Amino acid sequence: MVTKNYLIDKVHDKLDYLSKQDVKESVDLILDYLNESLKEQKRIEIRNFGNFSIRKRKFPESNKFYNTVYYRMPKNLFKD
């Protein structure tokens, strides 16, 4: 499973000229921006990774609605 700490470690391995704290702050900023964008009902498109958006869903037993994150991956994500 990929966690935030795992992601920070991998980015730090690739960009070893940055301190781990700088990488952590960068990852936190990116995730915060993505989170805020979804809260504002904005669509997020990351080329060659996928699209994220908010969809309204209805509870089956009631007329109440809730928001859920919808992810659509590109067709070529798992092609070699």
Curated annotation (Swiss-Prot):
SMART domains: BHL. It comes from Rickettsia prowazekii (strain Madrid E). Coiled coil: none annotated. It holds the Pfam family Bac_DNA_binding. Histone-like DNA-binding protein which is capable of wrapping DNA to stabilize it, and thus to prevent its denaturation under extreme environmental conditions. GO terms for cellular component: cytosol. Keywords: DNA condensation, DNA-binding. Belongs to the bacterial histone-like protein family. This is DNA-binding protein HU-like. GO terms for molecular function: DNA binding; structural constituent of chromatin. GO terms for biological process: chromosome condensation. InterPro entries: Hist_DNA-bd, IHF-like_DNA-bd_dom_sf.
